[in-house]
Amino acid sequence: KGAIGLAGRESLENLIFVVNCNLQRLDGPVRGNHKIIQELEREFRGSGWNVIKVIWGRLWDPILARDKKGLLQELMDKVVDGELQNFKAKGGAYTREKFFGQNKEVLEMVDDLSDEDIYKLNRGGHDPYKVYAAYHKAVNTKGAPTVILALTTKGYGTGSREADNTTHQVKKLTIENLKSFRDRFDIPVNDDELEKLPYIKFDSSSKEQKYLMETRQKLGGFLPARKFQDIALKKPDSELFGKYFSGSDG
């Protein structure tokens, strides 16, 4: 609290914090029967920070557009961390019943969505458009530091391990999990190569490779290095210390 209070008092507008709220312990803040994002929001706002919450991805936008009475928004506002984790861990049918099913009118908003569609409703921290918008707002905020509170899913993209508490214990993904990960993110690796976990190399003329090279140059090269400059100091004239030498017999 002392550190964030200092940043707020000094109006450190170039300071941006990002808190990954993945709702599981060990490496993510969580309040099973409460809401860590709102808790952090209070702390930072009270210390003079600009707070940006990136909670719901853009796949929710069409559903929110139907929410003329604010009923879906009300459900979103009151859901606690433990429930949010379950909605990802237990699939679309569970989410339809336990989340949308709390209100008949809200349930009707997703009548045209399959259970798979509901499962794919994304969190804001995994939506590049929402993340970009948050960073854009953060870097253009003047007069105060900014914190981005991003809701994410533990084990995102790992298939059956996604949002599962046992994700913490997983050291290696199975071949099926790797295939699921590859297919989900459209990674150009065929089945024969998958077990070797090859590095992905972009073509030298691709926009991705050009971006990486340009960024490396801006950062000063591929490997960080500490540069030391030796400065030779001129020895003072011994006459300056004459009285000290004579007082100690030389």
Regions found by a protein language model. Give the residues of each.
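A short alpha/beta connector and helix-capping loop motif
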Residues: 2-18
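Conserved acidic/glycine
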Residues: 16-18, 22-250
